[in-house]
């Protein structure tokens, strides 16, 4: 995977990796992200092909849980969330 969180999208966009794709970032940077010919989605985590983007910095937790869910399953991701006392249903990420 290639990932970007918050304004980290700029590196991916400058490299041309986001052109024509769906992605997210912190809400104040939606217009800047859209200027790179990206379909901006107001979600915490967006996964398209091998690229995963997260919204604000705190979305990094949900992005990490999402990757655990994708690679190791819901049970592992939910256990990780519970272990760090992060109240979330990982099936909704």
Enumerate the language-model features and the residues they cover:
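Active-site-adjacent pocket-lining segments in enzyme domains
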Residues: 1-93
